[in-house]
Amino acid sequence: MDYPFILKKAWEGYDASKTIRDIEDISAMVSTNHVFKITFDDDDIVIAKLSHFGKYEYFKEDHRIIHSLCNNLLYPFENVLSKSLLKNNRVYIYRHRQGKDDAWVVFYNPTRIAERMPRRLDEHHIITLGQQIGKFHKACSRVKNVLPK
């Protein structure tokens, strides 16, 4: 599957006025998704997620829910999830079908990170991380009533 070709077609469908200069694979290699950093000629950057596992309808539904969650989380978690790019007030999702290939792309604004965690966590960091993840899950459960069904 030609990922750069698919990403370029996806971007053309979103905003053909901007030209892609570079596509860098930044995937964590821990899932079936492929994640790319896209840099444009004007140095703007977006993140693209490409998937070809599962069903398009589920991918689309998942990203509608993620977008709603992202926009409804309150402080201090309002910037934890990346914001999807919208077109016509909807999450823009590109579907590529060619032969046996069926892949989907969604674009995100990059999330800013003030400080990265150490590569190896000591016990204090592990406890703090666990507490923050617990608080994040509680914040997510508080917005469940406003998420799409």
Residue ranges and their predicted role:
Residues 1-25:
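Juxta-kinase regulatory segment immediately upstream of eukaryotic protein kinase catalytic domains
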Residues 119-149:
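A cross-family kinase active-site recognition segment
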Residues 99-114:
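Conserved short submotifs of the Hanks-type protein kinase catalytic core
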Residues 51-100, 124-127:
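A conserved alpha-helical element in kinase catalytic cores
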Residues 46-47:
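Glycine-rich ATP phosphate-binding loop
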